[in-house]
C-alpha cells in the first residue's frame, strides 16, 4: 500500500515444484507395440501449421519463447536468435515490436501480437514465419505486463511510442475482443493479414487447461502453446508469481 503498486520481481520461480526430472514413463508391453531401442529412429522434427502455405519446421520440439526487447537487452535478443538458428529452432519477438537484427539472425521467427499492441506493426507481421497471439503467460496468468522504467531506454521507448524512463504497463485483456467469438475473429484477421501463408499460434498461461484448450481450439489456430508457472517473467507481482498457476 505504501508503494501504490504490487511488490514486483522478475526472473524464475523461487519455490520448489515438480520438474521434468520427476517424470516417470509407462513402457510398452502387450497393449502398445514394442520397438527396438537401438534400431528404431527417434524423430524430433516438429511441424507447426501444416495447413499453411509456409509451415514452420523445427528440428527439435523446443523454441525460444517471446521475451521483449527491454526485458532483455539487444545483445541477448540477437544472441538467442543466432543460437536458435544453429539449433534448428525458432525465436519469438515478445512484446514491443521487431528488432531488425533479431529477424535477420532468426531463420524461423514468430511475431507476437500482445494486449497492449506496443510496437505492433502489420508490415513487420508480414515478415514473420509465424504469428503468436499472446493471451497469457504461466507465471502471471490473467495479468498484464509490466516493464520497469529503468529498462525503458530511448530505443525501447521509440519502438513502443512511449516516454523513456517510465514504467510501462500492459492490460490483461486484448482491447478488441470480449470472448471466444472475438478471438476467432482475431485469428481470421491475422490469417488475412498474412494471406494464410504462416501459422497462427495462441499462447496461454496454464490455468483451467482442459476448458481453456477446448475454447482455444474452437478458434481454429494452427497451434496452442501452454506456458507453465516456472516459465519466468521480466517483472510481475511477487504474490501471483509465487502462488498461482500450474507447473509446466
Can you say where each PLM-predicted feature lies in the sequence?
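General beta-strand structural signal in soluble alpha/beta enzymes
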Residues: 91-94, 111, 133, 202, ...
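Glycine-rich phosphate/ribose-binding loops and adjacent secondary-structure elements
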Residues: 174-248
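Internal alpha/beta core interface subdomains
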Residues: 74, 78, 87, 154-197
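Carboxylate/His-rich catalytic cores and anion/metal-binding grooves
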Residues: 124-148, 210-227
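Active-site beta-loop-alpha junctions enriched in small/polar residues
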Residues: 67-69, 96, 114-116, 136-138, ...
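Conserved radical SAM core fold
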Residues: 71, 138-141, 162-170, 230-239
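C-terminal helical cap(s) of enzyme catalytic domains, especially alpha/beta-barrels
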Residues: 108-110, 147-156, 233-248
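Conserved, well-structured core domains of diverse proteins
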Residues: 1-62, 66, 71-85, 89-90, ...
